[in-house]
Amino acid sequence: MSDFDSNPFADPDLNNPFKDPSVTQVTRNVPPGLDEYNPFSDSRTPPPGSVKMPNVPNTQPAIMKPTEEHPAYTQITKEHALAQAELLKRQEELERKAAELDRREREMQNLSQHGRKNNWPPLPSNFPVGPCFYQDFSVDIPVEFQKTVKLMYYLWMFHAVTLFLNIFGCLAWFCVDSSRAVDFGLSILWFLLFTPCSFVCWYRPLYGAFRSDSSFRFFVFFFVYICQFAVHVLQAAGFHNWGNCGWISSLTGLNKNIPVGIMMIIIAALFTASAVISLVMFKKVHGLYRTTGASFEKAQQEFATGVMSNKTVQTAAANAASTAATSAAQNAFKGNQM
């Protein structure tokens, strides 16, 4: 209080600490923006750095986006579904086979009660000769093999028709060339020979092989069918004096007469188709044979069992044994007398 000056005429800034030159020099160096900024004034805009954006609420729904890697439980579910589908498929197949076996068993029982009559070839009732074989694909052949056996049956029929047309082709060739009498005669012989022999020698063994799953009959079919395929190739070739309207004979006949040559070319094409289809079906039957579990060892066992169980063979063996024993006894008795 001692420093307080009551003189009204004295300089008011004399004792003012804020008027010190060192203080006023520092205050003059403040940036001009701070002097002009008034925090309580609304007329002036705040500096750009101090402006804050309002918080906008997120309007998107809270959905979890799937990642690239699927969870482990998804893969397990898929594997379980595939395994279940496979089991259902196998179950349906087993049920179908069981139903087929039941149906075949009932039909076999009906046939055993009423007798199994031959129905092939389908001849009229008043014909002097009756059917020789029994054939029913739905009864004898399993479902998975019926289509193949039917195709082989149709192939046999196709070859028989081709042999029948071959007779007319050789006849037409003989009409324009009198030196082809041998071909015409052989064409008749081939039709009468190959039609029944092919049915008995390779088709019936195939039918019986699929009917009873016989390995021995499969091997009989393969052996005979290879020979049959060789016959198809020779017939398609058509060598002279062999009784076939093959390609060689067709070209020769075409030089003699164009209509006859065209007819022979058609027959040669049928023989060629028989050879090609025979090769395709041979591969198909061989593939099915590999899936049936047949083998050469089983064929040997079936052959031995069939031979030993055959009554004719048993009778012949017994007669041979008795004859040998009788002759041995007689020789021994004569030796003792001497």
Curated annotation (Swiss-Prot):
Intracellular or extracellular location(s): Golgi apparatus, trans-Golgi network membrane; Recycling endosome membrane
Pfam families found in the cross-reference section: SCAMP
Lumenal compartment residues: 177-181, 240-261
GO cellular component: clathrin-coated vesicle; cytoplasmic vesicle membrane; membrane; recycling endosome membrane; synapse; synaptic vesicle; synaptic vesicle membrane; trans-Golgi network
GO molecular function annotations of the record: protein domain specific binding
Oligomer and partners: Interacts with SYNRG, ITSN1 and SLC9A7.
Protein name: Secretory carrier-associated membrane protein 1
